[in-house]
Curated annotation (Swiss-Prot):
GO cellular component: cytosolic small ribosomal subunit
Matches recorded under PANTHER family: 40S RIBOSOMAL PROTEIN S14/30S RIBOSOMAL PROTEIN S11
Quaternary structure, from the entry: Part of the 30S ribosomal subunit. Interacts with proteins S7 and S18. Binds to IF-3.
Swiss-Prot/TrEMBL keywords: Ribonucleoprotein, Ribosomal protein, RNA-binding, rRNA-binding
Name of one Pfam family that matches: Ribosomal_S11
An example Gene Ontology biological process: translation
Tagged with keyword Ribonucleoprotein: yes
Gene: rpsK
Taxonomic lineage: Bacteria, Pseudomonadati, Planctomycetota, Planctomycetia, Pirellulales
Family classification: Belongs to the universal ribosomal protein uS11 family.
GO molecular function: rRNA binding; structural constituent of ribosome
Protein name per its UniProtKB record: Small ribosomal subunit protein uS11
Origin: domain of life: Bacteria
Function: Located on the platform of the 30S subunit, it bridges several disparate RNA helices of the 16S rRNA. Forms part of the Shine-Dalgarno cleft in the 70S ribosome.
NCBIfam families: PRK05309.1 (NF003698), uS11_bact (TIGR03632)
Length: 127
C-alpha cells in the first residue's frame, strides 16, 4: 500500500487574544480568538459537563472559562481582552476564572447589543 502524506497540524503561538464571554439565561459560552478574530478554542457550560438548569449557574460559567483558558495557554496565550455579551449569571465568574487560570486580563468590554427601540421583546414571565 502506498503511504499517504498527512500534513502535520502546527499549533500557532499566539501571545495575546480576545476572550468572548456570551452569557445567556440558559448557558455561558467562552470563545477565545486571536487579535484578528479567528477562533482558537472555545468551551461552554454544556461541554464542561453541566446539563439542564445547572448550565445557567455562575459555577458552570466559571468551569467553562477555566476549560477555555487551559486550552488557550496551550497556544502560548498570556494576555487577553475580555468582551462580555448577554445578561446571564456566568459573566463575572467567567472573568475571575480567566484571571485565576493565569491569563492577564488587559481590558473588560461590554458588548451586549442594546436596541434603540427595535424588535418587540418577548412577553414577561409570570411564575
Amino acid at each position: 500500500m502506498a503511504k499517504t502524506n498527512k500534513k502535520k497540524r502546527i499549533r500557532r503561538n499566539v501571545s495575546n487574544g480576545v476572550a468572548h464571554v456570551h452569557a445567556t439565561f440558559n448557558n455561558t459560552t467562552v470563545t477565545i480568538t486571536d487579535a484578528k478574530g479567528d477562533t482558537l478554542c472555545w468551551a461552554s457550560a454544556g461541554t464542561s459537563g453541566f446539563k439542564g438548569s445547572r448550565k445557567s449557574t455562575p459555577f458552570a460559567g466559571q468551569c467553562a472559562a477555566q476549560q477555555a483558558a487551559e486550552k488557550a495557554t496551550k497556544f502560548g496565550m498570556r494576555d487577553v481582552e475580555v468582551r462580555v455579551k448577554g445578561p446571564g449569571s456566568g459573566r463575572e465568574s467567567a472573568i475571575t476564572a480567566l484571571q485565576a487560570a493565569g491569563l492577564n486580563v488587559k481590558l473588560i468590554e461590554e458588548v451586549t447589543p442594546i436596541p434603540h427601540n427595535g424588535c418587540r421583546p418577548r412577553k414577561k414571565r409570570r411564575v
